Amino acid sequence: MGIKIGHASFDERVEKGIDNLFMRQAVSSAQERLKLAKAKAEEELGDWQEWRTLAEEIRSHTLDNLDYYLEQLSDNVSKNGGYVYFAQTAEEANVYIKEIAMKQQAKKIIKSKSMVTEEIGMNQALESIGCEVIESDLGEYILQIDDHDPPSHIVAPALHKNKEQIRETFKEKKGYSKSANPQELTLFAREQLRKEFLQADIGITGCNFAVAESGSITLVTNEGNARLATTIPKTQITVMGMERIVPTWEELDILVSMLCRSAVGQKLTSYVTGLTSTKEAGDVDGPEEFHLVIVDNGRSNILGTEFQAALHCIRCAACINVCPIYRHVGGHSYGSIYPGPIGAVLTPLLEGYDDHEELPYASSLCAACTDACPVKIPLHELLIKHRRVIAEQEKRTPLSESLAMKGFGLVASQPNLFKMGTKGAPYVLSPLTKDGSIKKGPGPLKGWTDIRDLPAAKKERFRDWFKTRGKGNIHHDSTTRDLSQ
């Protein structure tokens, strides 16, 4: 699939999202539910801000010493009997994974939820050599059989679908004949997937966090599918972004606590799995061969820059769950497998601005995302930095907008010009004004007036209003008098 999803323009995607009433209602309901659950989990933990600071320090320290911890991880995985491959690009990662599949003569591959495998387009790469890849996460499974519909949320990929739509998908693709009852739908999916686990030649997982000190990988799930993917197939492949690492189990304990509470409002998910070695003598299950693929794919270019904090992300989607923009347009509007505020920051860093220059502007800069982030990523500040890069370094600002801003800057910096401008604006704009508002504006105003009215400029300037009403006619209470003395 890759990071980019679809070929529609940003405006087309947003319009489609706004027109999808069900999606907007589903997102709104989910945001409210998750926000309340997270708040309760924070309160139960206590000292939430101190926990956030500690989590931020862990992520910052790890990234500042990433080369050391990756080397330690690699050495320990090798000591445990596994193989490690560092992939600089998505293509390199896919070539290595395909080589393993061909060597094992794999026909069927079972896979647990993984954002980085979506990012590198791994499924499509394996399908190109004749492998059948089965998604075992329920949400991802629904999307896969629905003609590879892309995910719209980092944690809940099928958030944009309702139970009736899922029933129709199961009926059309898998012969389902029962109701749209969620329990019946889940049991049906379970029956379908269980046989896939038993027949799989290779199991592939993502990695929530790798533990450098022991060479372990950890998986945090609520469905248990990842455990089956790592115990039944004889060969296991784990794919991880190079930043998804912690120094020790002690730091893991803290970050998993933050991840579960921030993602779904739970103290702990149903399954937290740590895997360290291949199957040993006497073991009844587990892989006989283990491969860890560590993916760069642009991450090293972010290290040491003003955007490095974006790599602190632990993929909890807390920022998405409070974002007012995501609430109204949904995940697909971002045109990336990484939606929401973190997607608007991360996607241009990994893919460039050519297809994603609108994303940093898909924000009200309300900072709700920054306040929600369990590792204190200053998301709204990073979005502003992106805008500055787009305007000053990339020179991508539309000419009309650039000229308008330069013109305003010139006028605003010259008191006499500003006075003339505010005095003349109502008369200049009067041909466009009707019933106290501008309904169709020219140039830079067009984007605004295409979807909302712009209040007309008043003929009485604020300075004139203040001269006649401000000084002598505004009541000053004791507080005001004290402050003015």
UniProtKB/Swiss-Prot annotation:
Gene3D superfamilies: Alpha-helical ferredoxin, NagB/RpiA/CoA transferase-like. The keyword Transferase does not apply. Residues 304-334, 353-382 form the 4Fe-4S ferredoxin-type domain. One of its GO terms (molecular function) is metal ion binding. GO terms for biological process: lactate metabolic process. Keywords: 4Fe-4S, Electron transport, Iron, Iron-sulfur, Metal-binding, Repeat, Transport. It comes from the Bacteria. [4Fe-4S] cluster 2 binds at C323, C366, C369. [4Fe-4S] cluster 1 binds at C313, C316, C319, C373. Pfam families: Fer4_8, LUD_dom, LutB_C. Is involved in L-lactate degradation and allows cells to grow with lactate as the sole carbon source. Has probably a role as an electron transporter during oxidation of L-lactate. Belongs to the LutB/YkgF family. This is Lactate utilization protein B. It comes from Halalkalibacterium halodurans (strain ATCC BAA-125 / DSM 18197 / FERM 7344 / JCM 9153 / C-125). The lineage of its organism: Bacteria, Bacillati, Bacillota, Bacilli, Bacillales. The gene is lutB.
